Amino acid sequence: MGYYHRWEEFPEKTLHYLVDNPNAKGVKSRRISTDRIMVSKVTVKGGGKIPRHYHEAEQVMLIQKGRARVTTGDKKVHELRSGDIWVIPSNVLHGVEYIGDVEAFEIVSPPRVDTLIGYVIPHTFFEKAKKS
């Protein structure tokens, strides 16, 4: 038995933890989830930035259109273009800066429940700024 859908059936929205982030106002997502995996289509208009963060889930991103600058763990910046794949291991700090208009697919396992229902899991989130 299988299920069949179209992306347009799922609402496009800003993730709750990005709503107040002016650097991410152009980042929208549609997502579908099962018990074990979540797939998201990310659409970015005019660029956007998601600060470095971490979560238990493993994540894979495929850039379909556009470019993004990403960091994983060591803070070395890598630029991704259409057709590039970014693999993010569990509990590794990572961040992304979308350059202009971007379309990407993300696959996350296990699903990040916090992004589906709007709460933040305590061990999941943004890198704290260093005090000077």
Identify the role of each PLM range.
Residues 38-54:
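Conserved short histidine dyad/triad with adjacent acidic residue
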Residues 57-68, 73:
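Glycine- and acidic-residue-biased ligand/ion/polar-headgroup-sensing regions
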Residues 1-36, 121-132:
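A short, N-terminal "cap"/entry segment at the start of jelly-roll beta-barrel domains
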Residues 64-65, 81, 100:
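A cytosolic small-molecule/anion-sensing beta-strand core signal
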Residues 90-116:
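Ligand-binding loop in jelly-roll beta-barrel domains
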Residues 74-90:
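Short acidic-glycine-tyrosine-enriched beta hairpin
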